[in-house]
A protein has these predicted regions:
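Intrinsically disordered, low-complexity acidic/polar segments
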Residues: 15, 57, 79-81
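Ser/Thr-rich, low-complexity intrinsically disordered terminal regions
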Residues: 23, 30-57
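C-terminal structural segments of small proteins and small subunits
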Residues: 7, 65-96
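Terminal, regulation- and interaction-focused segments at domain boundaries
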Residues: 1-20, 24-31, 35-36
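Feature captures hydrophobic
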Residues: 4, 27, 49, 92, ...
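Residue-level recognition of conserved beta-strand positions in structured domain cores
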Residues: 50, 61, 72-74
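Intrinsic-disorder/low-complexity, polar/charged segments enriched in Ser/Thr/Lys/Arg/Asp/Glu/Gln
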Residues: 1-5, 45, 67
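A short, structured beta-strand/loop element
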Residues: 56-65
Length: 99
């Protein structure tokens, strides 16, 4: 499966970033007509999965001391949404971390 990777720099504590990124990811999933989001945090890392436009999409989030990285695996049939997904994730996460 093709992968989308977005990394956003930050200067906040890992706990604060986790609290801010969670609603940003939830909003991004909703913006992409996503349903059935499963988001499982284990300290500074999360796995997620949701359905959108008939596709099952999964990925992970890694929060490091100076950056947060979101990896998204898209089915081949959803490749037409790759750039839109990348921009949507980058914008949502950056906005959440700016607040």
């Amino acid at each position: 499966m093709p992968k989308v990777t977005v990394t956003v720099e930050h200067n906040q504590s890992i706990g604060t970033v986790v609290q801010k990124v969670t609603p940003a990811i939830e909003k991004t999933v909703t913006d992409f007509q996503g349903q059935d989001l499963s988001l499982d945090w284990q300290e500074d890392r999360a796995d997620f999965k949701f359905k959108s436009l008939g596709f099952t999409i999964q990925g992970d989030i890694q929060v490091d001391p100076t950056s947060v990285t979101v990896n998204l695996e898209l089915p081949f049939a959803a490749m037409i949404y790759k750039e839109k997904a990348k921009k949507g994730i980058a914008n949502s996460v950056a906005k959440a971390l700016a607040d």
